[in-house]
Amino acid sequence: MSEKDRSNSRLPLHINIRTEIFKTKTNSLRKIWQNSFYLPHILKFLKINAKFKRQILFGILFIVFWICIYGISHFSNVEESPPQEMIPHEVDMLLNAFPTEGDGKATAILLNWSRIENLKTIVKHLCQYTMFKEIMIWNNNGDVHLSDQIFSEIRCRKLRYYNSPGNMHFIARYMACAMATTPYCYFQDDDWIIRHMRSMYANFLRYPDLIHTDTNADVYSLTNWKWCFFDDSIDLHACFSWVGTGAFVSKENVINFLKMTSITEMDPTEFAYGDMYFTTFMNQVPYQLENELQELPQENAFSAGEGRLRNKIFMHKALLHIYDHLTNRTGVFETKELYPTIYQRDVRSPCENDRCLFLTNKNSFPDVRTFRYKPSINISESERIHESYFGTEHFIKYPYSHAVDGKNWTVWKSSEVINKDDYIGLDLLFPMPFPLTFTLVVDHHRDYFSTLNIHISYNGMDWIQLAPLPKIIITQLSQTGLDGKTHLLSCSFRIRETGIRFVKLTSTREWEFPYGIHEFSFHAKPMN
């Protein structure tokens, strides 16, 4: 990719500086003397015994003199410290800085059947995010009437309800989105807490025509390998992805999907189970992020037990619909593969603190076009074929998210060695108004750092190579890597350019070892 110089535009910055009022130090001896219990009695004695005044005065001065000498020698280095909480600490300048692009442009859609307590937890979590104008709960349970009284302790003004006269199952979330007043919608089920909302939304805003979903490593290996279906001869390029573990979608795509359900003459049961059709009918690979999910109570889960087989049956029916229309060139489904295609993408996982996204060009699975889709092969058989060709155990054990999960003892390990022009990096979600310090903990040879190019970007497309390179400080840690012998290295460097959003570290040569990234993080704490 060509490198284009761009001016270093800076955003307007408002800094609120909190000042603390410190008490003026008081001489300790003087303070003790003034507050002494004996002072009034001494003065009274001097007044009554005036004739002894001179002798007593000299005596007191003599005693005070030696007390001062003693105090100077013992307390000259002691200062009265302010209370512990008033001592200034090193504060990250980004502590309360968050992306604001797209604020108020999304509606969160939740479905209710029986887990009211879960919904309360989810609503409280979602209400804090500024991207949501409203949080809509579609109630499929006719025996329950949702109202403000049920959610009174949440105190979320964004909350809205629709009490459906009947159970519309999963198609209800798409109908609710079509009713929304915002251009984007967010879906999730009632048995998860999705912790990386800002990260997923920031990437979605870059490519809003693509469905963005969130899942764990196990399911990621399905939705990016075993559940991908390609046939270039008819322009089939679809992958199935769950939306229940978090998904941002455009309202336009949802409305198009509802139109497709009518044109393809889906039967009422298929219509009710719309989740099994939505991502496939887009005929685009969803942009999926991988991370560790946080579960809520999941009794009677829809996809447990026999539900898994039922889901695969509907997944297969969705593929038969789209395959038939693409084969006959009916024009119902999109045939152009949108940018970025699956192999043009490099955003992999959200950082644990929801302040960045991990980037790398290294894919974890073979080319999805290795197998041409055949309607006669069902989903379970397709899974077996893919697994026999390439197992996913390595990725599930060492997934992308381990590079940015805040834990030095976990690791993302690439399945292949580092090649020339391979890179890792971070999307910082919005242009940074401060200089930043980056830290890497890796299981690499020390020479790796001497063959890096560091690039920065404002938009993720036009890159600027830093020259000269910033000073890289490398420290050997006591912790060892996966072999139990090689010590991990901690590398830190500072980028003083401001207004940047993307950073990547590119290898200028091939190495005989794979990526082993234990941690990749950044902060905006001032340098000492």
Please provide the spans of the model-predicted regions.
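Conserved catalytic core of nucleotide-sugar-dependent glycosyltransferases
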Residues: R157, C177-A178, W192-P268
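C-terminal catalytic/acceptor-binding lobe
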Residues: R30, K47-N77, P99-T107, E117-I122, ...
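Short, acidic, metal-binding catalytic loop of nucleotide-sugar glycosyltransferases
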Residues: E101, K124-E134
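N-terminal signal-anchor transmembrane helix specifying type II single-pass membrane topology
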Residues: E3-P82
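Exposed low-complexity, polar/acidic, P/S/T/G-rich flexible segments that act as propeptides
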Residues: E510-N528
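Active-site nucleotide-sugar/metal-binding loop of Leloir-type enzymes
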Residues: Y174-Y184
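A short, glycine-/small-residue-rich helix N-cap motif at loop->alpha-helix starts
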Residues: N118, Y162-A172, F271
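Short beta-strand/loop segment that forms part of the nucleotide-sugar
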Residues: L111, M131-V144, Y162-N163
